[in-house]
Curated annotation (Swiss-Prot):
This is FO synthase. Its cofactor is [4Fe-4S] cluster. Residues 76-320, 544-785 form the Radical SAM core domain. It comes from Nocardia farcinica (strain IFM 10152). [4Fe-4S] cluster 1 binds at C90, C94, C97. Keywords: 4Fe-4S, Iron, Iron-sulfur, Lyase, Metal-binding, S-adenosyl-L-methionine, Transferase.
Length: 865
């Protein structure tokens, strides 16, 4: 018992106490700095009296070690902010919440469904005048889904959703006041987080608890609240990590969870941070019962229980993750005990606005908070909404479009807030619409003569301060092991039965039958390949087709973190490059002179690329060569462009089509199974987003290819599932022109070098995958393309005799596979492609991008435009 501390009620879920020996052992392990397991964490949550004091000392030592390592020993941080309650409407019904209200009450109070823009700016300006640097936007989850009044309010002002409005007012605050938005809009999808990242320094959402029963059981605090499903909340936190968003989360203490559930919640957050390094702070918030709520009679969390939870959180998270407790939910004297328990951050404290979530608990005066902090032997220092290490790291954590805003308010050395800096509005805008060529622009040639300058991008491993570009490799290897456990077994009898069924109706098999074909080997595989070859002959004849084209990769600067990719580089790396629009147009003209009918343009996800950049590239090519077919931009690039432009996928694609885009590549698909996908990539779009982009493209009149990359951590069951998805899309839209098989090139791939992937597909895998594609896609997608870049001449010929009918293109340049270690060159002449087909006695025919016939034109004399 600490002198002067208010004794609160006992915990609402009385646990069975651990044995004294279990407590002694757990405390000893905490003192020794040993990693604690779940059982030990639960034991320590019971600590009281001398045991609690011992526990807190261990937690404080871990906290102090982290501060020392971060270069700011003896400091407690806080953010001077304003609280902007954008809307108090919500579709959830949490039993402890007084923040949320209903439309009738708002009308009775003379208030709108949302704050108007001028109301938002008034709050922000008052904060800016007092030196606040953070605009904390808090609001209910998707109120338009529950309340017609909210939907009407948004519609009348031209917004499709609450998140659209939040984006708009965030830009307004940046431009008019310079305050840095921290967004708390609740559960969001990957695409929604991506769309808001350019307007926010950080985001957050309390996990609250992983106790599913509090969501599923009637009468529990989260029952009837769709956004409080722990699985949904964890997915949103994961997506923020994939997108490198500095993210705040935390737990609520005393809302009906058991101590085991509480420990599980903390460990779930730890797992998230280990994988992505994005948890910038963890809030441990004690439940306070409020009048006019369903939980008004529930007891508050006991203070000793609260202290023990903070200490255990610190021990589980380690020295590098800030632990925060709100100073307004305890007495001033109790604040001292929170520091003793291991916190190193007070969170946002406002000199302007109340805590709208806990309006009955005013913020402490900042001078008082400083005195309390100093009484514990610490110095109170100001930060911005993103914690210092993310500010110092910059890209990909801080979007370039708010880079100037962040730089104006932060110290570049410490990453903390600049002393006495007053925010000033700055334009929120895209980079200049024109850009210059930079870096190793001759890589398209040099990759075949000189090779790479470096073997890995510079941000592959950034040390303890910030997790590297690919996330945590131990976590990834664990995911790969889980995938391996579920790999299917092969049974010869199943293969033969499936083969007989496929001969009768190739497109009508069950998934189990297709899986049997995909696992075939030996004589059975020969029979499957022979069937695929016969289906090819029946469908498209014996012609082997190709397109005369040029690949133009306009930049390899990318921060997405695809673990299979050796192409992506960080800006400033020795192999990084960007091509100007003029250079791209020049290359398109050169391709035209050499007989090309198509240019295929794809690039890395460079956050500094202008939002108009994609359309600018298309227009540049069309101005130079009006007849050139522009096949460009993967679904990942399209999502990136639409998100940054604040537009829908459909509107963005329509604008690109109007600029001259003809078709899009169906790349970035990899494997359309998120279990595999999240091993392959840290930040690329999820399967659902890929499907949305492709189906939307088809609907607006842009046809596409389809692809599958295989031979890494996948197994044949994933191929079947992937092809099943493509069949469904083709049945719906009819927009696929071809299916392209992309064997994984492993030599320089980070995933392989980390020991987490196979060394590419085997010959059996290649034959089975090509044959399976022909059989499963029969009657839906006629053209099956094989890759000479990845398989070489001999391998390509084998695939042409097992279901494939197309060679792809002449390419003229190819850097993606070559940087990954492919040894089969980056260009083929028409004669060389013809030789591949003639070597197996097949005729060859040039085609267009969409598989039309080509009428040869006379060679040009002068460039157009």
């Amino acid at each position: 018992m600490i002198e002067g501390v208010t004794e609160l009620a006992t915990p609402n879920v009385p646990p069975a106490p651990p044995s004294p020996s279990a407590m002694r052992r757990a405390l000893r392990r905490a003192r020794d700095g040993v990693s604690l397991n779940l059982d030990e964490a639960v034991v320590l949550l019971h600590a009281r009296g001398d045991d609690l004091a011992d526990l807190c000392r261990s937690a404080a030592r871990v906290r102090d070690a982290g501060l020392e390592s971060a270069g700011r020993p003896g400091t407690i941080t806080y953010s001077r902010n304003v609280f902007i309650p954008l809307t108090r409407l919500c579709r959830d019904r949490c039993h402890y919440c007084t923040f949320v209200t209903v439309p009738g009450k708002l009308r009775a109070e003379g208030k709108g469904m949302f704050l108007e823009p001028d109301e938002v700016l008034d709050i922000a300006r008052r904060g800016a005048a007092l030196g606040c640097k953070e605009a904390l936007f808090t609001l209910g989850d998707r109120p338009e889904d529950r309340w017609p009044e909210a939907a009407q309010w948004l519609d009348e002002r031209g917004y499709d959703s609450t998140l659209d409005y939040l984006r708009a007012v965030s830009i307004l605050v940046l431009e008019e006041t310079g305050l840095l938005p921290h967004l708390n809009p609740g559960v969001m999808s990957w695409a929604e987080i991506a769309r808001l990242k350019p307007v926010a320094q950080s985001m957050g959402m309390m996990l609250e608890t992983t106790a599913t029963r509090l969501f599923t059981e009637k009468g529990q605090c989260h029952h009837g609240s769709p956004d409080k499903d722990p699985a949904v909340r964890l997915r949103a936190i994961t997506d923020a990590g994939r997108l490198s968003v500095p993210y705040t989360t935390g737990i609520l203490v005393g809302i009906g969870e058991t101590l085991t559930e509480r420990a599980e919640s903390i460990m779930a957050i730890r797992k998230q941070h280990k994988a992505f390094g994005h948890i910038q702070e963890v809030i441990v918030q004690n439940f306070r019962a409020k009048d006019d709520t369903a939980m008004r009679d529930a007891p508050d969390a006991g203070f000793d229980e609260f202290r023990a939870t903070i200490a255990v959180t610190r021990l589980l998270l380690g020295p590098d993750v800030p632990v925060q407790a709100p100073p307004n939910l305890v007495s001033q004297q109790e604040c001292l005990a929170l520091i003793e328990a291991g916190i190193d951050d007070w969170g946002g404290v406002s000199p302007v606005t109340p805590d709208h979530v806990n309006p009955e608990r005013p913020w402490p005066n900042l001078d008082t908070l400083r005195e309390l902090t100093e009484a514990s032997g610490f110095t109170l220092v100001e930060r911005t909404s993103a914690h210092p290490k993310y500010v110092r790291a910059g890209n990909p954590w801080i979007d370039p479009r708010i880079g100037a805003h962040v730089a104006a308010l932060t110290d570049p050395v410490t990453g903390l807030a600049k002393a006495d800096a007053l925010p000033v509005g700055l334009p929120w805008q895209e980079p200049d619409e024109s850009w210059e060529s930079a870096g190793r622009t001759d890589l398209n040639i040099a990759i075949d003569t000189e090779g790479r300058n470096t073997e890995a991008r510079s941000d592959a491993a950034l040390g303890q301060d910030v997790v590297g570009a690919f996330g945590d490799w131990d976590t990834i290897r664990e995911q790969v092991r889980d995938l391996a456990v579920n790999a299917p077994e092969r049974l010869d009898s199943d293969v033969l039965a499936a083969l007989r069924a496929a001969e009768r109706d190739p497109a009508g098999l069950s998934d189990d039958q297709y899986l049997a074909l995909a696992t075939a080997d030996g004589a059975e595989l020969d029979a499957v390949a022979a069937l695929a070859d016969q289906l090819r002959r029946d469908t498209v004849g014996d012609d082997v087709t190709y397109v005369v084209n040029r690949n133009i990769n306009f930049t390899n600067i990318c921060y997405t973190g695809c673990r299979f990719c050796a192409f992506a580089q960080r800006k400033g790396d020795a192999d990084a490059f960007t091509l100007s629009t003029e250079e791209v147009a020049d290359r398109a003209w050169e391709a035209y002179v050499d007989g090309a009918t198509e240019v295929c343009m794809q690039g890395g996800i460079d956050p500094d690329l202008p939002v108009t950049g994609y359309a600018d590239l298309v227009r540049a090519v069309k101005r130079r060569v009006p007849s050139m077919h522009v096949h460009a931009f993967s679904p990942m690039e399209i999502v990136n462009g639409a998100s940054r432009g604040g537009e829908s996928i459909a509107d963005w694609l329509t604008a690109l089509k109007e600029a001259g885009l003809d078709t899009i590549p169906g790349t970035a698909a990899e494997i359309l199974d998120d279990e595999v996908r999240w091993v392959l990539t840290k930040g690329k779009l999820p399967s659902s987003a890929w499907i949305e982009v492709i189906t939307t493209a088809h609907r607006v009149g842009l046809r596409s290819s389809s692809t599958m990359m295989y031979g890494h951590v996948d197994n044949p069951s994933h191929w079947v599932g992937h092809l099943r998805v493509l069949r469904g899309i083709q049945d719906e839209t009819g927009g696929f022109t071809e299916f392209v098989l992309l064997p994984f090139v492993h030599q320089s791939a980070p995933l392989y070098l980390a020991g987490a992937a196979r060394p590419g597909p085997t010959i059996r895998d290649n034959r089975a995958a090509h044959a399976l594609a022909r059989i499963m896609l029969h009657g839906r997608i006629d053209n099956i393309q094989t890759s000479w870049v990845k398989l070489g001449i001999a391998g390509t010929r084998v695939m042409l005799q097992g279901g494939a009918n197309d060679l792809g293109g002449t390419l003229m340049e190819e850097t993606i596979s070559r940087m990954a270690g492919s040894q089969h060159g980056s260009a083929k002449t028409v004669a060389e492609l013809a030789e591949i087909a003639e070597g197996i006695g097949r005729p060859v025919r040039e085609r267009t991008t969409v598989y039309g016939r080509v009428d040869r034109r006379p060679a040009p004399i002068v460039p157009v435009g």
